[in-house]
Amino acid sequence: MSKKKEKKFQESKISTRSYRSTTMLRHQIRRITTANRLLDELKTSKDIEKFLNNSTWSIKELLQQPLTNTTTKEVSSDVVTKMLKLSGLSDSQDIQNIRKSLNLQMMFINHLYDKSGNNAEKKVNDNNCMFRLLASDHIPQRPLDLDTLMDEINKLEPSEEKGEIGFGIKDLQRDSFVINKK
């Protein structure tokens, strides 16, 4: 940092992190060719710092219950009980709170993956296939022993589909180096 910038930095009495943020933002603003209202408001470093420190939205806004119940599908207590059994956790007496928090998490995840970008309409996705639980998914596999592992290694062959192309000595000799056998 030059002495002139350092003096200006000390006079402004802002933190190093804020200074870096404002400097980066200032450089980005200079690059923008089209003007808008936001650029007119952000002229000084104090304006930029004030803008960066003010939040414009909250996660709590996204976690509100949907306005309409026509397309919503909530997690039932049976699903929560099944998830607790399959996870190996003890059956909790507080299933209603777990169900409520799972519904909120699903609503937030659906908001993150909402492709329409319409935040005003809060709805829960009907596609529950992401959250299905099958007992067959949790069957442990047979343990791998040394003999089985050695057999699988011996059976390996290069796969052209995966881009594993084998080569021989003849292919190596086309390059600029030579292999001498003794």
From Swiss-Prot:
This is Glutamyl-tRNA(Gln) amidotransferase subunit F, mitochondrial. It is an enzyme of class 6 (ligase). Its main location: mitochondrion. Subunit of the heterotrimeric GatFAB amidotransferase (AdT) complex, composed of A, B and F subunits. It is a peripheral membrane protein. It is found in: Mitochondrion inner membrane. One of its GO terms (cellular component) is glutamyl-tRNA(Gln) amidotransferase complex. The lineage of its organism: Eukaryota, Fungi, Dikarya, Ascomycota, Saccharomycotina. GO terms for biological process: glutaminyl-tRNAGln biosynthesis via transamidation; mitochondrial translation. Belongs to the GatF family. Pfam families: GatF. The keyword Ligase applies. It catalyses: L-glutamyl-tRNA(Gln) + L-glutamine + ATP + H2O = L-glutaminyl-tRNA(Gln) + L-glutamate + ADP + phosphate + H(+). The keyword Repeat does not apply. It comes from Candida tropicalis (strain ATCC MYA-3404 / T1) (Yeast). InterPro entries: GatF. This protein may be expected to contain an N-terminal transit peptide but none has been predicted. Its EC number is 6.3.5.-. GO terms for molecular function: ATP binding; glutaminyl-tRNA synthase (glutamine-hydrolyzing) activity. Allows the formation of correctly charged Gln-tRNA(Gln) through the transamidation of misacylated Glu-tRNA(Gln) in the mitochondria. The reaction takes place in the presence of glutamine and ATP through an activated gamma-phospho-Glu-tRNA(Gln). Required for proper protein synthesis within the mitochondrion. Keywords: ATP-binding, Ligase, Membrane, Mitochondrion, Mitochondrion inner membrane, Nucleotide-binding, Protein biosynthesis.
